[in-house]
Amino acid sequence: MSSGGLLLLLGLLTLPAELTPISGQDRPIKPGLCPPRPQKPPCVKECKNDRSCPREQKCCRYGCIYECRDPIFVK
């Protein structure tokens, strides 16, 4: 295999690692989506990632606001 082909293969294998979701940068990621943005003062940080939230709640980011919210599920 040529060096160009090897680099392409390596790039394709590492692509999924680059596509991490915004909500909860650290794993595990919990199922569901974050509900619409709450009305709160700017830049409140109640959580860092999904693991810092209780039960099934997700750490949801709305601009500079991070808060634990119950997930919503879309069909």
Curated annotation (Swiss-Prot):
Gene Ontology biological process terms, A to Z: antibacterial humoral response; innate immune response; venom-mediated disruption of cell wall in another organism
Signal peptide: 1-24
InterPro entries per record: Elafin-like_sf (IPR036645), WAP_dom (IPR008197), WAP_four-disulfide_core (IPR050514)
Coiled-coil ranges from the UniProt annotation: none
Expression (tissue specificity): Expressed by the venom gland.
Single annotated GO MF: serine-type endopeptidase inhibitor activity
Domain WAP residues, every copy: 27-72
PROSITE patterns in the cross-refs: WAP
Source taxon at top rank: Eukaryota
SS bond list: C34-C60, C43-C64, C47-C59, C53-C68
Compartments reported by the entry: Secreted
Pfam families assigned: WAP
GO cellular component, one term: extracellular space
Keyword set, alphabetical order: Antibiotic, Antimicrobial, Disulfide bond, Secreted, Signal
Family, as annotated: Belongs to the venom waprin family.
Purpose: Damages membranes of susceptible bacteria. Has no hemolytic activity. Not toxic to mice. Does not inhibit the proteinases elastase and cathepsin G.
This protein's name: Nigwaprin-b
